[in-house]
Swiss-Prot record:
Keywords: Cell inner membrane, Cell membrane, Membrane, Protein transport, Signal-anchor, Transmembrane, Transmembrane helix, Transport. GO terms for biological process: protein secretion by the type II secretion system. Residues 226-235 have a biased composition (Low complexity). Residues 1-34 are cytoplasmic. Residues 205-235 are annotated as: Disordered. The gene is xcpP. The chain crosses the membrane at residues 35-55. This is Type II secretion system protein N. GO terms for cellular component: plasma membrane; type II protein secretion system complex. Its main location: membrane. Involved in a type II secretion system (T2SS, formerly general secretion pathway, GSP) for the export of proteins. Required for the translocation of a variety of enzymes across the outer membrane. The keyword Transmembrane helix applies. It is found in: Cell inner membrane.
């Protein structure tokens, strides 16, 4: 009698467990996709929140950003560093050439619309000022290359050198030496003009003498006499 009762109890327990396991499996099959979707959404939300927190940390840290302009300013204030980083800059093509060391003084410049027609008055040491045209030879190996309002350019040994007007040293009032030098320059310019006028007069006189010496051919006189015919009397 006892063994039969124990077997009945065991059978009742299995019958109670089997319906519960079947219901749980059906519930999992029904809601498994929804659970996976919820888990995926939660994971994505956590990832986005982590990225947003990192971005906010970068936006709230101005100390590192403010330190960079200081370094840029220090680089700008030191031209030697720029030269080492980027090398020496090319020279400005419009900049005048270096000043010449020749003993020459620029007295005047005549700038024309055609640069080839420009000229300048230059005085060498111990000599009178002379007027030179562009391309004219001032001394051995030195030629006048270009003429500007404030300077002239000389070609010497294949390179260009600039000869500016002499600068006054001192205040607004000119010294006696400056006044004397200016008077000398004016006299020298006047003498040059007189020489040019004298040369022009000589050329005109020579041309006039040449024209006077050349005989002018007179036109041949036309014979105005008309042939006369002797009238004959008819019988």
């Amino acid at each position: 009698m006892i063994p039969r009762r124990s077997s009945d109890i065991t059978i009742k327990t299995r019958s109670d467990v089997l319906p519960f396991s079947g219901a749980s499996s059906r519930w999992l099959q029904r809601y498994a996709p929804a659970l996976l979707a919820v888990a995926l959404i939660i994971a994505m939300s956590i990832s986005l929140a982590w990225q947003a927190a990192g971005w906010l940390r970068l936006q709230r840290s101005p100390v590192a950003v403010a330190a960079s302009p200081v370094s840029h300013e220090s680089i700008r204030s030191d031209p030697t560093r720029l030269a080492r980083l980027f090398g020496t800059s090319a020279q400005d093509p419009n900049a005048p050439p270096p000043a010449t060391n020749l003993d020459l003084v620029l007295k005047g410049s005549f700038v024309q619309s055609d640069p080839k027609l420009s000229s300048a008055i230059i005085q060498r040491q111990g000599d009178k000022p002379h007027r030179y045209a562009v391309g004219g030879e001032i001394s051995d190996g030195v030629k006048l290359h270009a003429v500007y309002r404030d300077r002239v350019e000389l070609q010497r040994g294949g390179r260009l050198e600039s000869l500016p007007f002499p600068h006054r040293s001192g205040g607004l009032l000119a010294s006696a030496d400056d006044i004397t030098s200016e008077n000398d320059s004016i006299e020298q310019l006047q003498s040059l003009q007189d020489e040019n006028a004298a040369a022009l007069r000589e050329r005109l006189d020579a041309l006039r003498q040449q024209m006077e010496a050349t005989p002018i051919a007179e036109p041949a006189e036309e014979d105005s006499s008309e042939p006369t015919t002797t009238p004959t009397e008819s019988d």
